[in-house]
């Protein structure tokens, strides 16, 4: 599904778990102001190296997603392609609380994660039901596409 075609991407974008950083770099090339974060220092170093010769609206930061206090209400769009389902179950609540903190009432959050209905991919990850509960508890509205 192409998020650009849906018209749901807005000016200030957070790419959560941004490795390999192609989404952040692509959106920045289209004029979006993008912050890419990843807990991996190596991933951020690679991202910075790739963009060092580019003039773009992207900043990469090595951060724990649950500690983004300075971004209160800042992001119009959050994209998570595989980060949320990779974290420990005990980190789901801090993650979704952070989502609630960094978004405003009109923000869009796009979260792609494994589902328990996809048996070929489902292993130790929790499925969409658990994700939905964590999002709901932290007042992150769910939109199914």
Swiss-Prot record:
Gene Ontology molecular functions: methyltransferase activity
Broadest EC class assigned to this enzyme: transferase
CDD domains: AdoMet_MTases (cd02440)
Methyltransferase found in the keyword field: yes
Keyword entries, A-Z: Methyltransferase, Transferase
A UniProt-annotated Pfam family: Methyltransf_25
GO BP: methylation
Superkingdom, taxonomy of origin: Eukaryota
Enzyme Commission code(s) on record: 2.1.1.-
Function according to Swiss-Prot or TrEMBL: Probable methyltransferase.
Family the UniProt entry places it in: Belongs to the methyltransferase superfamily.
Annotated protein name in UniProt: Uncharacterized methyltransferase C750.03c
Species of provenance: Schizosaccharomyces pombe (strain 972 / ATCC 24843) (Fission yeast)
Organism lineage: Eukaryota, Fungi, Dikarya, Ascomycota, Taphrinomycotina
């Amino acid at each position: 599904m192409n998020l650009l075609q849906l018209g749901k991407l807005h000016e200030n974008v957070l790419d959560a778990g941004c490795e390999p950083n192609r989404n952040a770099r692509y959106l920045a090339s289209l004029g979006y102001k993008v912050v890419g974060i990843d807990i991996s220092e190596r991933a951020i170093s690679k991202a910075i190296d790739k963009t060092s010769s580019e003039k773009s609206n992207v900043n990469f930061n090595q951060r724990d997603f649950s500690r983004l206090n300075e971004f209160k209400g800042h992001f119009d769009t959050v994209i998570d392609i595989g980060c949320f389902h990779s974290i420990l179950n005990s980190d789901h609540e801090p993650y979704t609380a952070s989502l609630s903190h960094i978004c405003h009432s009109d923000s869009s959050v796009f979260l792609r994660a494994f589902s328990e209905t996809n048996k070929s991919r489902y292993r130790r990850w929790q499925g969409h039901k658990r994700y939905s509960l964590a999002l709901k508890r932290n007042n992150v509205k769910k939109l199914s596409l």
